[in-house]
Amino acid sequence: MAKISVLVAVYNTEKYLHQCLDSLINQTFDDIEIICINDASTDCSLKILQTYAKKDNRVKVLEMPLNSGSAKARNAGLRLATGDFIAFVDSDDWVSNNAFEQIYNTFIS
């Protein structure tokens, strides 16, 4: 079980997705699971997610059959989450490489 489950709802963000996922897999705190919920993207987002999942076993991909919006996608991801803590990152954003280390240390102190 991961300490932190990071949920990323994805819809047509292929332009930004590499930077987002790179920022997550390169965290200084690596006891995370990265749950990416593809919300029926019509671009190459799903292919990008699958590539990252093959490279890093912390990356999990969930496919929504229909575009349902970020709230439903996040709720679907929550059902798969095993972490003690939950974090949300937008798929067109990225985080600093020590973000989750700082967050975790703050929570446990």
Task: Enumerate the predicted regions with their spans.
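Nucleotide-sugar donor-binding/catalytic module of glycosyltransferases
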Residues: 1-109
